[in-house]
């Protein structure tokens, strides 16, 4: 399992860091078997796994439930679990209680929280021993306000993002996720920080990349963002389900190959 120090060392050696989301035991097992460096249990599970319209409906209980499953499936991978909407920003005491509950009950290596406004929370969480990954740029929990669009696209916005990135690092963040920002801006931020910067829709100038498992494998999704490359096609599973349906209806399944050979009814009838 990678440690924070090893991830920082990868950045220093210019070794790119791979990160993929996982939301359950089997997907986590696959990601670990592939040798991916980090797993993100993202609140994107609301759409990909639970069928919600957005991340807004995801609860702390949802994140704990799925985080536990992922840890069981990937015991040797660095796991980061998202703080869902409403878990940060109420009061510092409640925020820290939520963070501690999520961190302890999932046995994660770190938690992730969105936005530049959480800098005080990062400081306090770090002080009590909870590693925090920050998330800037497009923050899905705020799409109701900012929408799904490129962030940092003006001079003022870019300068603010650079400042925000420096501030979350200063507050103690162990890594930073940058989403949907210009490539050159992401590269500039990565150069300014000592912590690993993981990009999603932020070009190749970051220290690593993260993609959503279901997006990159075409698993039950209807829309892919511009920055998503499809690496496999899990939708072919539908063909297998159709074949199963046909074989059940025709009587072709189960054949002798898939049937126990033991005969028992003669013994039952002889006892009558």
Swiss-Prot record:
UniProt cofactor(s): Mg(2+)
Q: Where are the transmembrane segments?
A: none
Which GO cellular component terms, listed alphabetically, does the Swiss-Prot or TrEMBL entry include?
cytoplasm
Q: Name one GO biological process term.
A: pantothenate biosynthetic process
User: One Pfam family of this protein, by short name?
Assistant: Pantoate_transf
Q: Which reaction does it catalyse?
A: 3-methyl-2-oxobutanoate + (6R)-5,10-methylene-5,6,7,8-tetrahydrofolate + H2O = 2-dehydropantoate + (6S)-5,6,7,8-tetrahydrofolate
Query: Which residues carry out catalysis?
Result: 179
Give me the residues that bind 3-methyl-2-oxobutanoate, please: 43-44, 82, 112
What is its subcellular localisation?
Cytoplasm
Under the heading InterPro entries, the entry gives: Pantoate_hydroxy_MeTrfase (IPR003700), Pyrv/PenolPyrv_kinase-like_dom (IPR015813), Pyrv_kinase-like_dom_sf (IPR040442)
Domain of life (superkingdom)? Bacteria
**Keywords annotated in UniProt:** Cytoplasm, Magnesium, Metal-binding, Pantothenate biosynthesis, Transferase
EC number(s): the record gives 2.1.2.11
Q: Which GO terms describe its molecular function?
A: 3-methyl-2-oxobutanoate hydroxymethyltransferase activity; magnesium ion binding
Kindly list the positions annotated as binding Mg(2+): 43, 82, 114
Pathway recorded for this protein = Cofactor biosynthesis; (R)-pantothenate biosynthesis; (R)-pantoate from 3-methyl-2-oxobutanoate: step 1/2
The cofactor note reads: Binds 1 Mg(2+) ion per subunit.
The entry describes its oligomerization and partners as: Homodecamer; pentamer of dimers.
What's the stated role of this polypeptide?
Answer: Catalyzes the reversible reaction in which hydroxymethyl group from 5,10-methylenetetrahydrofolate is transferred onto alpha-ketoisovalerate to form ketopantoate.
Homology family: Belongs to the PanB family.
Identify this protein by name. 3-methyl-2-oxobutanoate hydroxymethyltransferase
Q: Which organism is it from?
A: Staphylococcus aureus (strain MRSA252)
